[in-house]
Structures are given as C-alpha cells and as structure tokens.
Regions:
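Positively charged, low-complexity terminal tracts
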Residues: 1-56
Length: 56
C-alpha cells in the first residue's frame, strides 16, 4: 500500500494530518495523535457515509 498523507487544512502546515499506511491510520499532530487500525478507520468512514456522524 502506498502511504497517503492529507492535512486537515490546506492553508497552513500547523493543522492535524491524516496518514494512512500498511500499519494503520494516524490522525493528529505531534504527541496529540490517535492511531486506528484499518478496520477502525473503515468503520469511521462507514459511520460518516451512513450519516450517523455529521458536521458539528
């Protein structure tokens, strides 16, 4: 799997990033990060797509 890295803000380099690798998904910045397995990430994406998680 080719790693994917996306910043949550296109206007600066200080915002959290989402990094997807063969080992899992990391969301955050510096020490403020959460690590998800691929299964956990897929569940999160599914919840969003099904409308169970929405903008706040």
């Amino acid at each position: 799997m080719e790693p994917v890295k996306v910043t949550l803000c296109a206007y600066c380099t200080e915002c959290p990033e989402v990094e997807i690798t063969d080992r899992g998904v990391t969301i955050g910045e510096d020490e403020n990060t959460v690590r998800l397995t691929h299964a956990e990430w897929n569940e999160l994406v599914g919840l969003i797509k099904r409308g169970e998680l929405r903008e706040i």
